[in-house]
Amino acid sequence: MILILRSKRQVNMANEKLTAISPLDGRYADKTEELSRIFSEYGLIKYRVEIEIRWLQMLANNSEIIELDKFDTDTNNQLNQIIDNFDVSDAESVKEIEKTTNHDVKAVEYFISRQFNDHKNINDFIHFGCTSEDINNLAYAMMLKEARESILNPLMISLHKEIKGLALKHRDTPMLSRTHGQTASPTTVGKEFANVLSRLNIINNELNEINIYGKLNGAVGNFNAHHIAYPECDWLEISSKFIKSLNLEPNLVTTQIEPHDWMAKYCHNLIRYNTVLLDMSRDIWGYISLGYFKQRLEKNEVGSSTMPHKINPIDFENAEGNLGLANSLFGHFAEKLPISRFQRDLTDSTVQRNLGVAIGYGVIAIKSLLKGINKLEIDEIVINNDIENRWEVLGEAIQTVMRRYGIPEPYEKLKTLTRGNKITKSILSDFVQSMDIPDHAKNGLLNLTPSTYIGLASKLTNLSK
């Protein structure tokens, strides 16, 4: 017998997943692990530490702040190492300090100052002129920027690639359309995926064009403390330069808080992106139900606890559920965050701590869709059998050609012929033969079938990028 020994740490990690309140840190922890370095309490503290140190270094580089000597190489290296080597144990130290301060940002300030106990000159300028929100708004801005660049964009690109592959592979595969749930003019399987891809690309491009703003201007946004201490300094320029050094856009005219308008735009963008995915998930679910799409069998998976035959569309259902959760949170963020009483209230603090939760649900959804799409197979036999028995969809083609050649009441005549009736090829052929139109037009209609009446679907699919 082979005994598999697990370390205490491994056991603790397993227990943490089992006892987590949120499924993001429990059942789905393996799918959201990459988010924890950004949006966890550790991640937030790490960004706060970085911002405090970078602000201190900028002040030291300003020759007009004569009470703070320019840092030598050793001091700068020591400060940089605090950022570069910051780990969970450091975050735990900050949390221990917070037990005394009962203030999370002040705890960060004290954590840094303890690294320089013998340098009162340095400690006096840690958090200089700042309100907590100066640090926090920049931290959340950097977090959302990092999430966009290192997590959301790569996932979106992967999803777009899979959708594009299906679009191009099946651009010429005719499929019956349905409007209002009823048969409609044919399309192609690929064109329907191209529709989704086009929407996603537009929204993703807009996401990447959103400017991410930050502010550092003091307790009510007027540089009161900065200006009274050093009136000779150009604090507007110093603040702008600092924020730009973090690869953010400066917002100089604010109250105590950066107003979060860009954040609302970011959230609204992800709502729109997720809504397109929700639309696609439901359509794929429907096509699976119709038998148009099949799911590749995974040998050891179980579809139902009682019905052995089932292969359920669980990936698309999982995506749908998580997209709904993400959007409900993003909607609240977008409505709540731009509102703050007078110059500031604290209601945004607890709300912003959940930004990673909303993104996490979206990440789970995209990963579920990638898994589901990779198991999809198109059943062209079922699709073809369905479309070839729906001759009534050619009513549109016939009445439109009749219009061209001036035949009276074309729509009304086709409505009488087709609406509510079982239409066959022979019925349509007899009707076309009776029409007074040029032979070439008549032959074109006689040779037309439901599967060839796809317009420019294939050409349009090729436009998808």
For the regions a language model picked out, list residue spans one by one:
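Short amphipathic alpha-helical segments with heptad-repeat character
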Residues: 145-153, 157, 194-197, 201, ...
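N-terminal amphipathic/basic-hydrophobic helices that include classical n-h-c signal peptides
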Residues: 1-12
